[in-house]
C-alpha cells in the first residue's frame, strides 16, 4: 500500500531521528567515563591530575620548609653550614652530596612528534619511577630521625608529611596510568640511594651528610614534578594547556 506523501515524509523523518539518536548513543558510549554533574562533567582522570598537582604543591612547600629548618634549627644548622662551606670549597664528598640526585628526569614529551601518545605513556612511567625513587629514602629518614636524640618535632613532622604526600602522589600517578593505558606494563625501577648507608650510620656527621643530600634533592625536584604533571595533564586530558 502506498503511503500518503505527508505520512511518508513523517516516517522518513522518524527514521532519520532514530538513526541519529542511535549514532549519538554510540558516540557517547565510546567516551571515557565522565560523571554528569550540575554545571558540567566530572572527569575522574582530570580530578586525579588535580589531586596530584595539589600534592605536588604541598610537597614543594614542605620541602622548602624542611630545607630551611635544617639550615637554621640548632639541631642541624652547624653541620649544614659546615657542609655548605665545604661545597663552596669544592670538597668532593660535599659536592657529590650537594649536587647529585639519584633520580633523574629526561626532557618532557614532545606533542609535535608522530608518536606523541607513546611518548606520553613513556614519560608518565618515567615520572612514576622518579617519584617512587624517594619513597625508601624518606621512609628511612623518618626512622632515623625518630631514633635520634633532641630531634625537633617540626623537622620530624615535616619529614613524615613529605613521605606521606610522596606515597599518595605515587598512588595517583599509578591510578592514572591504569586508566589511560589499561594494557600498559609498568616495571618499577626505583634507583638505589647511595647515601642510605650514611643515613643509617652511627656516625652523626655521616647522617647529616645524607640529610644534606636528601633535603637538597627533594627541594629542587619538586619543581620538576609540578612541571611534568602540568605537561602530562595537558597531553592526556587536553586541559590547562
Swiss-Prot record:
One Gene Ontology cellular component: extracellular space
Location within or outside the cell: Secreted
Pfam family, one: Hormone_1
One Gene Ontology MF term: hormone activity
Domain of life: Eukaryota
Disulfide bridge map: 34-41, 101-217, 234-241
Main location group: secreted
InterPro entries hit by this protein: 4_helix_cytokine-like_core (IPR009079), Somatotropin/Prolactin (IPR001400)
Glycosylation sites recorded in the entry for this protein: 213, 220
Keywords: Disulfide bond, Glycoprotein, Hormone, Secreted, Signal
GO biological process: cell surface receptor signaling pathway; female pregnancy; mammary gland development; positive regulation of lactation; positive regulation of receptor signaling pathway via JAK-STAT; response to nutrient levels
Residues in the signal sequence: 1-30
Tissue expr: Detected only in placenta.
Similarity field: Belongs to the somatotropin/prolactin family.
Name of the protein this chain belongs to: Prolactin-8A9
Organism of this sequence: Rattus norvegicus
Taxonomic classification: Eukaryota, Metazoa, Chordata, Craniata, Vertebrata
Amino acid at each position: 500500500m502506498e503511503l500518503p506523501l505527508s505520512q511518508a515524509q513523517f516516517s522518513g523523518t522518524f527514521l532519520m531521528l532514530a538513526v541519529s539518536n542511535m549514532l549519538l548513543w554510540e558516540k557517547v558510549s565510546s567516551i571515557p567515563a565522565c560523571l554528569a554533574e550540575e554545571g558540567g562533567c566530572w572527569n575522574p582522570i582530570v580530578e586525579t591530575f588535580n589531586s596530584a598537582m595539589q600534592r605536588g604543591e604541598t610537597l614543594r612547600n614542605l620541602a622548602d620548609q624542611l630545607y630551611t629548618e635544617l639550615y637554621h634549627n640548632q639541631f642541624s644548622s652547624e653541620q649544614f653550614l659546615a657542609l655548605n662551606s665545604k661545597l663552596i670549597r669544592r670538597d668532593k664528598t660535599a659536592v657529590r652530596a650537594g649536587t647529585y640526585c639519584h633520580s633523574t628526569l629526561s626532557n618532557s614529551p614532545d606533542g609535535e612528534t608522530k608518536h606523541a601518545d607513546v611518548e606520553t605513556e613513556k614519560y608518565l612511567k618515567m615520572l612514576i619511577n622518579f617519584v617512587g625513587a624517594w619513597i625508601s629514602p624518606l621512609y628511612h629518614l623518618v626512622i632515623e630521625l625518630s631514633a635520634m636524640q633532641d630531634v625537633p618535632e617540626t623537622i620530624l613532622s615535616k619529614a613524615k608529611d613529605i613521605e606521606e604526600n610522596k606515597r599518595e602522589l605515587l598512588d595517583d600517578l599509578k591510578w592514572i596510568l591504569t586508566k589511560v593505558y589499561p594494557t600498559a606494563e609498568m616495571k618499577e625501577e626505583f634507583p638505589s640511594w647511595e647515601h642510605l648507608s650514611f643515613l643509617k650510620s652511627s656516625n652523626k656527621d655521616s647522617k647529616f651528610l645524607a640529610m644534606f643530600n636528601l633535603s637538597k634533592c627533594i627541594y629542587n625536584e619538586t619543581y620538576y614534578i609540578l612541571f611534568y604533571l602540568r605537561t602530562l595533564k595537558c597531553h592526556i586530558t587536553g586541559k590547562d594547556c
